[in-house]
């Protein structure tokens, strides 16, 4: 965590996040580090579909057609967050942390992580094997931090 804050500070980059299944854990992890105010711009928890639609302006047809846990929804979340926040790096997370809510097509542990830096956008599909909610959330935060560091270098 300290490495991320140090790297973003050195590069003079601002970060914003929109979280769903992690419920603010990513923002909390980053802002727990002294100096985070230099790099952390905005943190949103858009847990419900309505929050994604109202706050992040995700088109309701995307959620209806593909679901909130999808590549398409994650992409809309990160693109629209970047319009709101004007940060250099924007991150979106949507997934199924469990222990319930999974299906054969979308099992518990399925998470999409979107990262946008400038015009470059990447959507990462992850499947965390744990059935424990907290383990999936922690693994998602760790993976997201690694991705942010990688794109920031």
Indicate residue ranges for each PLM-predicted region.
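Short alpha-helical segments enriched in small residues
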Residues: 1-153
């Amino acid at each position: 965590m300290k490495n991320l804050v140090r790297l973003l500070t050195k590069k003079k980059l601002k970060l914003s996040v929109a979280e769903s299944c992690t419920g603010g854990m990513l923002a909390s992890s980053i802002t727990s580090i002294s100096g985070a105010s230099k790099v952390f711009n905005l943190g949103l928890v858009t847990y419900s579909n309505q929050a994604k639609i109202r706050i992040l302006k995700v088109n309701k047809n995307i959620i209806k057609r593909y679901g909130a846990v999808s590549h398409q929804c994650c992409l809309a979340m990160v693109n629209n967050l970047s319009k709101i926040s004007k940060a250099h790096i924007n991150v979106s997370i949507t997934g199924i942390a469990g222990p319930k809510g999974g299906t054969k097509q979308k099992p518990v542990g399925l998470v999409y992580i979107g990262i946008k830096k400038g015009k470059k956008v990447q959507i990462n599909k992850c499947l965390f094997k744990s059935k424990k909610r907290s383990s999936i959330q922690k693994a998602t935060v760790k993976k997201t931090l690694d991705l942010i560091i990688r794109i920031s270098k």
